[in-house]
Amino acid sequence: MAVEKVQAFEKVSIPTEKQPGSEDLGFDPAELQKKYEAERNLRIQNGGVSQYRSAWKSGFGYYLEDPNADANFSRDPISARYDVVIMGGGFSGLLVAARLVQQGITNFTILDKSADFGGTWYWSRYPGAQCDVDSTIYLPLLEEVGYIPKEKYSFGPEILEHAQRIAKHFGLYPKALFQTEVKTCHWSEEDSLWTVQTDRGDNLRAQFIVSAFGISHMPKLPGISGIENFQGKSFHASRWDYNYTGGDSTGNMTKLADKRVGIIGTGATAIQVVPKLAESAKELYVFQRTPSSVDVRNNRPTDAEWAKTLRPGWQQERIDNFYAITTGENVTEDLIDDGWTEIFRLVAAPFFASADIEQSLENRMEQVQIADFKKMESVRARVDSLVKDPATAASLKPWYNQFCKRPCFHDEYLQAFNHPNVTLVDTRGHGVDAVTTKGVLAQGKEYELDCLIYSTGYEWYTEWEQRTRSQVYGRNGLTITKKWSQGITTYHGWGVHGFPNFMVLSSAQVNNVPNYTHMVGYLSRHLAYIVRTCKDRGIKSVEPTATAESKWVQQVVEQGAARRDQMKLCTPGYLNHEGDITEKTDRLYSYNGSGDSKFQIILDKWRDDGKLVGLSIDCATEADL
């Protein structure tokens, strides 16, 4: 699909001529607008997300091979009956399992294609891997398992270890089937059960199935020619090959000392791994389409004395405080005090504050835009202060609004470009031209390499079958792929009409905040409540009504109108479907109600009411209602 080039801010009134008083701001909003438009239009390509390649559908399945698993693993097929089958063993699946256990439901199994729990953190073992949300709120169930993170932002090994700690604490290892991929899920009208079949020949029957695949598990590759022709070593960052590079998650990749290394991509993963590669490689070439916004991280060890003062409920208090700030509430204290809360105070706060005095949406968005300009000016100034070469610094400056891409925070990335062995290859928004037998062709020049690393991210809401390598068949054989062919439809972000007892955990149509584990943690309690309620009342199946689903989707789309208009103006990336904004992508937005219409308040009241409003209920007998 062709993507239009945008020539003006559609909903935000930014003057097209220099205005009196712009000198006080330190910048001219009109000139910044023009710069943003030019940078966006430079990068727009037709095709949206289809410009990327699916690793497993494009004949590049070897990029998906698990370097941490036993390649010779085998087991006999299993036939069993469960209350719940959980598909995914990352934090989403772990949280659902933990909440089920707390509800007294233990007859469930967890399936995962990896060889252990951890999800994203099982796969993301690249050097420097680290969470970008305060670890005391990102790592779930800290009080339940009795653990305090070592640093403000935990590194990958600690996060993976914590996932395993949760699994041990709740007795989940005996319930797990690892190195097992779901292939099909079929709903049976006869007995109101799901049949789940796997690549190991398993035949599992369950009353409920939970999709906890997560959003960062299927690597994607750039849609460029020649990937298969490269004669050197290549791998995706989520399948890091330490046998080739040497070292470990802390760096020290001694085997790269005589190697010319290239990395394609400058998103969140590259921000963390580039400094480690810069320390180890003989030569490092960073191929950039669009620079990330990189602000101060300020990581530091956890204060042991502070940890001793924590009282019961401390983690939920911190989670709630972060949630309040990032959803526009006025709070008296910022318990997290990091880059995220600063952004929301400076950029998003004007939107919510002006809503209280009944300003028009247009005026509120104008205030937000000015605040955004100010914040991004400081981010660009930071580049100048840290990068010595003026030309390199100019290429590393992000020219777009703060939330066009997920903001990054790091204290070594920009400085890495001061190393004499590091070269930034700025493709001026076009991306690399091709991969050759010897290296990478970019801007008409071939860069010869020994090793090429793809830091190109994961598939983000592509078609279900493509993203999960599985298919779900609901009532009358309807597939979830077909059901969602025109966009995701849910009720409260988890239930799907036509798919009884099918529960989805994702970031779409829920109150998606920067702390993903907070939202899946909240939803996991909600889903466990529904399962428990069905057991207690003798309910065989629950399914959103078509009306309830339709109304919820409409609310999401309507609330996302301002966000949609902003995303049209962004440089392409996964958050705006590579610039291809349609009604289908509108349905990926969060539910952003405020006040009594906040997502969590709505679901809290829904549970308190106890009537399962919006769901069709099929009971074993009328007496069970």
From Swiss-Prot:
Pathway: Mycotoxin biosynthesis. The record marks R406 as: Transition state stabilizer. Binds 1 FAD per subunit. Keywords: FAD, Flavoprotein, Monooxygenase, NADP, Oxidoreductase. InterPro entries: FAD-binding_Monooxygenases (IPR050775), FAD/NAD-bd_sf (IPR036188). Its EC number is 1.14.13.-. GO terms for molecular function: monooxygenase activity. FAD binds at D112, T120, W121, Y122, W123, D132, Y138. Its cofactor is FAD. NADP(+) binds at Q130, C131, D132, T266, G267, A268, T269, A270, I271, Q272, R289, T290, K405, R406. Belongs to the FAD-binding monooxygenase family. Baeyer-Villiger monooxygenase; part of the core atranone cluster (CAC) which products are predicted to catalyze most or all steps of mycotoxin atranone synthesis, starting from geranylgeranyl pyrophosphate (GGPP). The initial cyclization of GGPP to dolabellane is probably performed by the terpene cyclase ATR13. The Baeyer-Villiger oxidation near the end of the atranone synthesis, which converts atranones D and E to atranones F and G is predicted to be catalyzed by the monooxygenase ATR8. Of the CAC's other predicted gene products, the reducing PKS ATR6 might synthesize a polyketide chain. This is Baeyer-Villiger monooxygenase ATR8. It comes from Stachybotrys chlorohalonatus (strain IBT 40285). The gene is ATR8.
